[in-house]
């Protein structure tokens, strides 16, 4: 077994990052590559609470990882420059999403985790018309639907919904307006 020579030390960021989408993922299936880059978030609603008047700002950064077979992100709220030691736990988000293309189902398998808020979800994502829709469930089994809507090269509207106990009504719990920074 050969080892990585001392002069070839690689940090996790270098080993994780990829230059672009893997050729194994058809261009027509690339529902997330347009997100690559950094975004400023205007938080409108979080955990069902209307927070628009609080002017909470966040940030999100997206990039290809795992030899281009996945798109990973980090969502941060409040943004790093505004974080303090006494952050309100109900408004604290510092989590990551891993979206991996699965050719067997012709969709993306998605795992989200926010350790700051003890929140985890598994979803399946794909194009639905002009939107990207992710369906899945929280760790407690609550069905969820997350959507990227109003997509342009420089902006998107993100909606997070949870199915109510009646099994018919979707409640809007999260809403972010995003503008591209880079």
Predicted feature locations:
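Hydrophobic small-molecule pocket/channel-lining residues, especially in calycin-type beta-barrels
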Residues: 1-182
């Amino acid at each position: 077994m050969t080892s990585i020579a001392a002069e070839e030390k690689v940090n996790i960021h270098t080993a994780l990052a990829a230059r672009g989408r893997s050729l194994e993922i058809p261009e027509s299936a690339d529902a997330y590559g347009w997100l690559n880059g950094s975004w400023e978030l205007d938080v409108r609603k979080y955990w069902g609470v209307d927070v628009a008047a609080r002017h909470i700002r966040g940030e999100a950064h997206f990039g290809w990882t795992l030899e281009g077979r996945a798109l990973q992100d980090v969502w941060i709220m409040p943004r790093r420059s505004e974080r303090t030691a006494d952050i309100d736990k109900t408004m604290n988000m510092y989590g990551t999403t891993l979206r991996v293309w699965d050719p067997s189902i012709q969709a993306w398998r998605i795992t989200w985790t926010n350790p700051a808020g003890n929140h985890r979800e598994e979803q399946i994502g794909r194009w639905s018309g002009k939107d990207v829709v992710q369906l899945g469930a929280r760790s407690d089994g609550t069905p969820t639907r997350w959507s990227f809507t109003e997509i342009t090269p420089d902006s998107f509207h993100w909606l997070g919904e949870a199915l109510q106990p009646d099994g018919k009504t979707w409640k809007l719990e999260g809403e972010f307006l995003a503008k591209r920074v880079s």
